[in-house]
Structures are given as C-alpha cells and as structure tokens.
C-alpha cells in the first residue's frame, strides 16, 4: 500500500508548499485536489498551466502522483479532468456520487452517469472511482453493491472511505469485506459520532475518532490491496500552516504504525 495525503488539507496554500509539507510528513505520494472552493491546486479550467508545475514538484520532492479528486460528474469537466490526469500522470480520478439518498430513480441516474464516465476513463487509460457519501445516492454498502453490480468496466472501481460508511451506521471493517475485491482507491480519515459531517479537521486525524482503522487496513492487507491510501482531511483551508502539518504528520504516523502492526511494512 502507498500512503498519500490529499492536498485539500493544505487548501489555503500554494502547491510548492503543499508538496514540501507532505514530503516532510513522510508520505509516499500525493492525491491532488481539483475541488473547486476548497483549494486552488489543480484548477481544471486551466489544467494545461497546472500540469507541468505538478509534475515538476512531484519529481523534485520524490512524491508519487497517486490520484486526483475531482468531485463533479459533469461530462465536460470530467473530460478535461481525464485529459489532465493523462498529461500529469495521475492514474486515478476520484469523483463524488451525487444524487439523493433513499431515491431509487436518483441512484439509477447516478449509475447511468458513472457508466458513461467509466467508458471515457477506459478511453483515456485511467481509472474512475466513486465512494459512498453521506446524503448521496450511494451512501452505504447496499447502494454501493448495486453500483458495482451494474458497472463491470475494469476502468471503474470503488474509492472506499470508512468515515462515510461509519456515518451510515455501519461497521467500516465489515463493510470493507463485502466490497474489497472492487476497491481501487482508499480515502482515510477518522470520525467521532455519526453526524452528517466528519468533524473539525484535527478530529479527522487517524486515531482521534471511533473507527477501527487498524482493522480496516488489516482487511486491505489480507486481501492483497496494493493501491493508494490517501488521507483526506477537509475544512482546514483557513488553518495556520503549522497546524495542517501537524495533522498530516500525526495521521501518517498512525497509518504507518497500523501497517507495521499488520506486517505490511
């Protein structure tokens, strides 16, 4: 498994600062945020300008380019995102599910949309991943399984995020066992309680909440998962840089200890 951090944790800072701090925290790689409103890292509207900067920074800091997070399923936006992924060398694009929880028609619309986007991902030679998300059409294990049954493209996979499954009232470790064969990316953070939001950024750091992340990573290891495990902490755009660095380092230390306990490192 490759440990990375999503640049959205450092959403208030420029890319040179982000790469430097993620390297200093000891991560293997980086997930580049293309989340409008949360960061100005990979801006899809001007990706041609961003691409060489990202490639140069990755080489300079020895960080693997693990994934991109671009939440929109808009076909034009995603087409540009896929072109950017190819140019930069990002093998995975993580998008949001969209839609409405508990609405079968909404879920079917999401399945249709993701199926079309998976075809485009195959065209570009990248992998499209989606995760269950609180309040969205895909929000728990049953809805996740419906999507996985409907879309068999090898260019499509699951981005498994234990914090959303936890807030859906499930046990993330058991939920992971049901889908692990289709997992191609992992977003990781901790969470206290089962409310709609994941909590303050510092409360999302691995080990601060209620999720059995050791058990979670053990299941991944036991099933031969070798893909990215990317820390995704949101809400820290206005935080001082030092605080963002501390969150990144704390979470990475917890992940490293978990992998060592599993025998994965």
How would you describe each model-predicted region?
Residues 9-11, 34-36, 71-73, 97-101, ...:
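Active-site-proximal loop/turn and secondary-structure-junction residues that shape catalytic pockets
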Residues 49-53, 77, 172, 213-216:
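Alpha-helical scaffolding within the catalytic cores
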Residues 31, 67-69, 94, 129, ...:
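Conserved beta-strand positions in the central sheet of alpha/beta enzyme cores
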Residues 41-48, 76-81, 241:
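Metal-dependent catalytic neighborhoods of phosphoester/phosphodiester hydrolases
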Residues 57-60, 64-158, 167-169, 243, ...:
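Active-site acidic/histidine proton-transfer and metal-coordination neighborhood
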Residues 1-7, 11-29, 59, 86-89, ...:
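Histidine-acidic metal/acid-base catalytic patches
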């Amino acid at each position: 498994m490759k440990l990375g951090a999503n640049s959205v944790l450092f959403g208030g800072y420029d890319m040179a600062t982000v790469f430097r701090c993620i390297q200093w925290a000891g991560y293997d790689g980086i997930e580049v945020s293309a989340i409008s409103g949360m960061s100005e890292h990979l801006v899809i509207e001007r990706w041609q300008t961003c691409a060489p900067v990202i490639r140069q920074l990755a080489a300079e800091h020895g960080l693997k380019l693990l994934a991109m997070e671009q939440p929109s399923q808009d076909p034009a936006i995603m087409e540009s995102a896929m072109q950017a992924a190819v140019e930069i060398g990002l093998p995975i694009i993580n998008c949001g599910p969209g839609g409405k929880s508990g609405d079968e028609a909404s879920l079917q619309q999401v399945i249709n949309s993701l199926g079309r986007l998976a075809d485009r991902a195959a065209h570009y030679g990248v992998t499209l991943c989606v995760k269950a998300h609180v309040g969205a059409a895909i929000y728990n294990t049953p809805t996740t399984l419906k999507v996985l049954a409907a879309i068999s493209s090898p260019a499509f996979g699951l981005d498994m995020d234990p914090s959303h499954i936890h807030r859906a009232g499930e046990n993330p470790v058991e939920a992971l066992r049901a889908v692990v064969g289709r997992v191609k990316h992992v977003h990781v953070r901790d969470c206290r309680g089962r409310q709609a939001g994941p909590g303050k950024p510092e409360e999302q750091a691995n080990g601060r909440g209620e999720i059995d992340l050791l058990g979670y990573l053990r299941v991944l290891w036991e099933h031969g998962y070798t893909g990215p495990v990317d820390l995704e902490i949101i809400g820290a755009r206005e935080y001082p840089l030092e605080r963002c660095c501390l969150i990144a380092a704390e979470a990475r230390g917890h992940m490293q200890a978990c992998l060592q306990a599993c025998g994965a490192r």
